[in-house]
Each structure stands twice: as structure tokens, then as C-alpha cells.
Amino acid sequence: MGSQELQRKLGFWAVLAIAVGTTVGSGIFVSVGEVAKAAGTPWLTVLAFVIGGLIVIPQMCVYAELSTAYPENGADYVYLKNAGSRPLAFLSGWASFWANDAPSLSIMALAIVSNLGFLTPIDPLLGKFIAAGLIIAFMLLHLRSVEGGAAFQTLITIAKIIPFTIVIGLGIFWFKAENFAAPATTAIGATGSFMALLAGISATSWSYTGMASICYMTGEIKNPGKTMPRALIGSCLLVLVLYTLLALVISGLMPFDKLANSETPISDALTWIPALGSTAGIFVAITAMIVILGSLSSCVMYQPRLEYAMAKDNLFFKCFGHVHPKYNTPDVSIILQGALGIFFIFVSDLTSLLGYFTLVMCFKNTLTFGSIIWCRKRDDYKPLWRTPAFGLMTPLAIASSLILVASTFVWAPIPGLICAVIVIATGLPAYAFWAKRSRQLNALS
């Protein structure tokens, strides 16, 4: 067993690239249409993206403080543990491993193949093997080198931003101001009310998730006291600007009623640009593959750090805490999570069912934001960076997180509650087993 610790090798730009690369995913290809449908008017659509990004800043401030107080790998697991609840911390990690981390790898890999199928026909079984090959390729990349993986992540993040920049640049030339004078597509949107805006903001929520992924790797980040706040808040602002400009341009390119009813808003909007025309679908498919490749790479890189942290605390399978003696990476954790992701590729029905665990994952995030209140009561709590206007920012972080909890509950209330029961029913016995084992190991040491 490798007993060495992971080293701090990641600088600011690599960390920023991971945060932005994880956040800018496939969701943006449909979310503009969903936000337009919810908000009901072009201006409310754009404003929803602005406010949707701004309300994420308090969340990033909370993560920044917690990550500088506990500059180690593990993110939510570490913060909940230090807030005084090891069982809750374990349950958060337990749910993440089985219902979120590995399934997300399979979902993204299959999404890449799906977009590839737009360019050339692919046999379904062959497509699954291609998806598995993508996971294996990224496993090898991130297993062999943290620096190499970070360099790739930086390049792929730049590559995924370029197509959106092209869309924004071209869209400005064919922007039609009259599209912003279009009548509202919903009764609530016609009133320009706060409820219409709130509906739009809620629809943007998923587009802004992912920045906190870097907290899983805080133990490998150089100078976390400065790097984490800059990367977390900086990534939020960068994504906010990108999404707002994209929403503005798309709303100005095509009639708003068509945008609000579009399931492929970016692709449909690009058909209104003469320079692209019929090639819009191909452009979007290639862009989507690049975007999702970056997100898949990022997840293969950061997600195994959670199980690594739990294993180091003797609260998970011991092998997950192994560090490769040459490459200084959590090799076993990367391999086993990737292997489980490949398994889910070939059991697609199970993967779709695991989507119902989203309610549990959203509630876990809310608990994490609340954990800072308990952490601040500890005598040994000494963060290197503190949340400004703590009394305002923390409630905002919790409230904005609850928006996702509420919308997810409305989407699938009964399945979501059943999944919560499953997490508790399986997680607590597992915690009892590992907690007992941990006490025994501590007694022997």
C-alpha cells in the first residue's frame, strides 16, 4: 500500500481551468431555451442569467472560506466532518460515490458518442465501447500525472470557450434588436413580474453548478489561501459573462417564441447566421463533443479525491487511499471509480434511475453551506480567507441552494424521497462498520 501523501502541484491557472471546465458543460446547449420558456421575455431571460450567476457568488465565498480553513482533499465530506457530524459527512460521500460520481462519467461519455453519431452513424454497442474507451483514456491521463492532467484541462477549457466566443462574435453581426421587442410567451412573463424572473433564475441554476469541484483537490493546490478564493469567485464571474453574452446574442438572433419552444436553442439560433446556415448542426455537435470531453476529463480528475479522503480517515475501502509511488496520484481510486463508470455505460437503465438521487445531492450542498456556521464556532477554526458580509452571504448561499432542492423535489418528489431513504438505509450501516473499524485501528496505533 502506498502511504505517501498527495503533493501540492496545481497553480492558479490550472485550478481556474478545472473550475470553468467543469461548469461549462452540455447543459448550456439546452438551458437558454429552458430559461427563455420560464422567463417569458428576452430581457428577463438575459437578466435571469445575470442574477443566476451573481447568486452563486455567495456559495463560492462559503466554499472559499471552508477550503482555506481545511486545505485538504474531500470538499463537502471534510467540511461536514469538521462541522461535527462524521455520520453526515460519510453519507454525503457515500451518496456521491454510488449515485453521482461514477454515473456522471458514463452519462458524459455516452453524450459524447451521441454527438459523434450526429456526424457519422455508430452502432449502439460500438458506441458503448467508444464511451468506455474515453473513460479509460482519461483514467490513464490523470493517473500518470497531476500536472499533465491539469495541462490538458487548461487546453480543453480554452478549446471549449473558443466556439462560444465565435458564436457570440458572429451573433453580434446578425443581431436583430426587434427580437427583444417580441411579446411575452407566457402570461406571467407579460407582467414582467418578480415571479417570472424567479422562474428564469431557477432555470439557470444547473448551468452554474460545477465550480466547487476544485474543493475536492484543495490538498493538491499551491497556496490555497490565495488560490482558492481567486479561482472560485473568478470562475463564477467568467462563466457569468460567457452565459450572459450567449443568452443576449441567441435572444437577438431568432424570434423569441421559437427560442422559448426550442429543445436545441444554440443549434437553432445558429441557423439564423448566414455564415453557418445548414452547417449549424455540425458546428454544435463538434462544440458539444469538445465541451463534454472537458467536463469528463475534469470529473475523472477530481472526483476520486473524495473517496481518497474518506479512505485516509478509515471511513471507506482502504485501497482507495493508495497513492502511486511514482506518479503521486490516487491511482486505485481513479481506476475503481472509472471501472464503475464503465459498468454503468453497459447498464444504462440503472444510470437513468440514479438520476433520482439528484435531490439528495442538492440537499447535501445546502448542508455544506450551513456547515460553515458550526465550523465558525470551533476554537481551532482559522481560515486564511473569510467570507465578506458573512451574515448576508451565508443565508444567500443557503437560500439559493434551496432553489435547486425545491425545483428537484417538484421534478420527482416520490422517487427523490425514496432515494434519500435508500442513502440513509444503506449508508448508516456502512458508516457503523467503518467507524468501528476506524476506532479499532486508532486503538492499535
UniProtKB/Swiss-Prot annotation:
Main location: membrane
Localization, UniProt: Cell inner membrane
Classification via InterPro entries: AA/rel_permease1 (IPR002293), AminoAcid_Transporter (IPR050598)
Record bears the keyword Transport: yes
Cellular-component GO terms for this entry: plasma membrane
Membrane topology type: Multi-pass membrane protein
Keywords of this entry: Amino-acid transport, Cell inner membrane, Cell membrane, Membrane, Transmembrane, Transmembrane helix, Transport
Residues that span the membrane, as ranges: 10-32, 39-61, 97-119, 126-143, 153-175, 188-210, 230-252, 272-294, 341-363, 384-406, 411-433
Recorded catalytic activity of this chain's protein: N(6)-(D-fructosyl)-L-lysine(in) = N(6)-(D-fructosyl)-L-lysine(out); N(6)-(D-psicosyl)-L-lysine(in) = N(6)-(D-psicosyl)-L-lysine(out)
One term of GO molecular function: L-amino acid transmembrane transporter activity
Gene3D superfamilies: Amino acid/polyamine transporter I
Keyword field contains Acetylation: no
Biochemical pathway: Carbohydrate metabolism; fructoselysine degradation
Role summary: Is likely involved in the transport of fructoselysine and psicoselysine to the cytoplasm, where they are degraded.
Family: Belongs to the amino acid-polyamine-organocation (APC) superfamily.
Name of the molecule in the record: Probable fructoselysine/psicoselysine transporter FrlA
Gene from which this protein is expressed: frlA
